[in-house]
Design a protein with these regions (language model features):
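Conserved beta-strand-centric core segments of catalytic alpha/beta enzyme folds
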Residues: 1-49, 149-228
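Conserved beta-ketoacyl condensing-enzyme motif
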Residues: 1-2, 100-117
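Condensing-enzyme catalytic core mediating Claisen C-C bond formation in acyl metabolism
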Residues: 16-96, 104-105, 223-228
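Short helix-capping segments at alpha-helix termini
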Residues: 54, 97-98, 127-133
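Beta-strand segments within the central parallel beta-sheet cores of soluble alpha/beta enzyme folds
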Residues: 56-64, 101-108, 134-141, 170-179, ...
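A general structural signal for well-ordered alpha-helical packing
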Residues: 58, 82, 86-89, 100, ...
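Short glycine/threonine-rich loop-to-helix capping motif typified by GTGT followed
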Residues: 71-82, 110-127, 147-154, 184-187
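Stable alpha-helical structural segments in soluble proteins, enriched in small hydrophobic residues
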Residues: 88-96, 122, 126, 155, ...
C-alpha cells in the first residue's frame, strides 16, 4: 500500500480581501506565490513528419538547456543558484544558434517572491542586456498562479500562442514594479496591457524546486521554413 498527501495553501498574505490580486510577480508589494492548477499539452515532431501529414505548426523548438545548480552558493530547494541559471540561459542560446539580440520576449519563471529581482538580474547578465535593451518580460503566473510541476507546460503553451497569434500578454496586478527590477530593466519592457507584436523568437524558462533549471528557445513558424 502506497499513499501520498500534499496540502496546498496560498502562500501570499497581503491580499486576502481581494484574492484575484494576490498573484503579482515583479511588484514591490508581492508577498509570495499563489498556487494554481492545470495542464499544458503539445505534440513534438520533426518538420518532415509534420508537413507530410498536413499538421498545423505553431512554433519551432530551436534548442534549449536543462541543468542543476546542485543547491550550492545561494541555491536551495526553493531558490535557484544564479550561476546555474545564467549558464542555462547562455547554453540554451548557443544550442539554439541564436544571439541575445534575437530574443523578442522572455516568458519568465517569475513567481512573486523575493527572488524575482534576482531572476531579472540573471537574465540581464546572461543576455548582456540592460535598460531598454532587455527583451520584453512577462509571467503567466500573474494570470493562473503557480501550477508547480505543471507550470512549465502551461507557460510553454502560452509562449507558443504568443508567437503564433502575435501578442504579448500583460503582467497583471503589476501596479508598482519592484525598484530593484527597475534598476535593471526599463519599465516599458514589463507590459501591463496586452500588446500586439509580431514576435519571432521567445525564450521560455523554468527555474524550479530543487534548484533545477530549464530554458527553451522557440521560433515562430512560417511557410518559408519548410526547407529547414
Amino acid at each position: 500500500i502506497w499513499g501520498g498527501l500534499e496540502a496546498l495553501r496560498v502562500c501570499t498574505f497581503k491580499h486576502n480581501d481581494a484574492s484575484e490580486q494576490g498573484a503579482r510577480p515583479m511588484t514591490a508589494s508581492a508577498s509570495g506565490f499563489v498556487p494554481g492548477s492545470g495542464a499544458g499539452a503539445f505534440v513534438l515532431e520533426n518538420l518532415e513528419t509534420a508537413l507530410s501529414r498536413g499538421a498545423r505548426i505553431y512554433a519551432e523548438v530551436l534548442g534549449g538547456c536543462i541543468n542543476s545548480g546542485g543547491q550550492r552558493e545561494q541555491g536551495s530547494m526553493t531558490a535557484p543558484n544564479s550561476s546555474a541559471v545564467k549558464s542555462c540561459i547562455s547554453k540554451a542560446l548557443v544550442e539554439a544558434g541564436v544571439n541575445s539580440e534575437d530574443i523578442d520576449l522572455i516568458n519568465a519563471h517569475l513567481t512573486a517572491t523575493a527572488m524575482d529581482a534576482t531572476e531579472v538580474q540573471n537574465w540581464s547578465l546572461a543576455l548582456q542586456k540592460s535598460g531598454k535593451n532587455v527583451p520584453y518580460l512577462n509571467s503567466l503566473k500573474s494570470h493562473v498562479g503557480h501550477a508547480l510541476a505543471a507550470a512549465g507546460s502551461l507557460e510553454l503553451v502560452s509562449s507558443i500562442l504568443e508567437l503564433s497569434q502575435g501578442f504579448i500578454f500583460p503582467n497583471l496586478n503589476c501596479d508598482t514594479i519592484h525598484p530593484d527590477i527597475l534598476e535593471i530593466v526599463d519599465e516599458e519592457k514589463i507590459p501591463r496591457t496586452l500588446l500586439k507584436k509580431n514576435l519571432t523568437i521567445i525564450a521560455k524558462a523554468s527555474f524550479g524546486f530543487g534548484d533545477v533549471n530549464a530554458c527553451v528557445i522557440l521560433k515562430k513558424y512560417s511557410d518559408g521554413d519548410k526547407s529547414a
